[in-house]
Amino acid sequence: MIVKYGGNAMKSLDLRRAVARELGTLRGAMPLVVVHGGGPVIERELAARGVASEFIGGLRVTTPEAMDVVEMALCQLNKQLSQDIGQAVGLMGRDDELLRAEVLDPQLGRVGRVTGVNAGLLRTLLGAGLTPVVGCVAVGEDGEALNVNADTVAGAVAGALGEGAVFLTDVDGVYRAYPDPDSRAAQLTRAEVEDGLAAGWIAGGMIPKVRAALDALGRGAPFAIIASGMTAGVLAQAARGEAGTRIVP
């Protein structure tokens, strides 16, 4: 199973370590690949160095100067997460060309779209009983680093390995009538998600989350789950279908 971890769930050190412990425990039941972003950490490091943050369409404009800071921040976070999980191998997407990408839009600078995953490397590590922890910096066609979206990376890795993806976020699933707690959908098909987007009951911050789930399905993942990363124990519950929203083809 591929677990995408990031965002607000990373802001609390105690919560981050609790999730890492859960990942370490769950690894005994199933092979795991962890994909992480680092938005809050990156913001802090950029601000500390006086590098301005600019976004276009929700994506960070990444100058060469900003790319250096992004890669440094993700490397530090990658090492910390790997240590917290235990029996894990921290990898950046540039290691052994784990993640290959092309420039998404010249206006965004060093921002990429994933075009390939070194699935063989991941399978080798999983076969050795290790948990790959992947930071989202890819190698571009020019050999230089590209900043890639963690949700998209998780979907690409899930598709390359033929495994399901779990997107840990700050909400506990997709609701048909948010915030009514009884309206959380346990499972949705791709068609139902598209209907929800068209009808407007999937809206706001949930839109990019379900888009990431649909992208994972489109890349070959058998399912994608959106679940809360703010609650201890949710990963095992989501794997059993007891938490979050499972999206299927």
From Swiss-Prot:
EC code(s) of this entry: 2.7.2.8
Site entry: Transition state stabilizer: 4, 209
HAMAP family tied to this protein: ArgB
InterPro entries noted in UniProt: AceGlu_kinase-like_sf, AcgluKinase_fam, ArgB, Asp/Glu/Uridylate_kinase
Keywords recorded for this protein, A-Z: Amino-acid biosynthesis, Arginine biosynthesis, ATP-binding, Cytoplasm, Kinase, Nucleotide-binding, Transferase
Pfam families hit by this protein: AA_kinase
Location of this chain's protein in the cell: Cytoplasm
GO cellular component terms, semicolon-separated: cytoplasm
The organism's taxonomic lineage, starting at the top: Bacteria, Thermotogati, Deinococcota, Deinococci, Deinococcales
SUPFAM superfamilies noted in UniProt: Carbamate kinase-like (SSF53633)
Annotated organism of origin: Deinococcus radiodurans (strain ATCC 13939 / DSM 20539 / JCM 16871 / CCUG 27074 / LMG 4051 / NBRC 15346 / NCIMB 9279 / VKM B-1422 / R1)
TM spans (from-to): none
Protein name: Acetylglutamate kinase
Keyword Cytoplasm found: yes
Pathway where this protein functions: Amino-acid biosynthesis; L-arginine biosynthesis; N(2)-acetyl-L-ornithine from L-glutamate: step 2/4
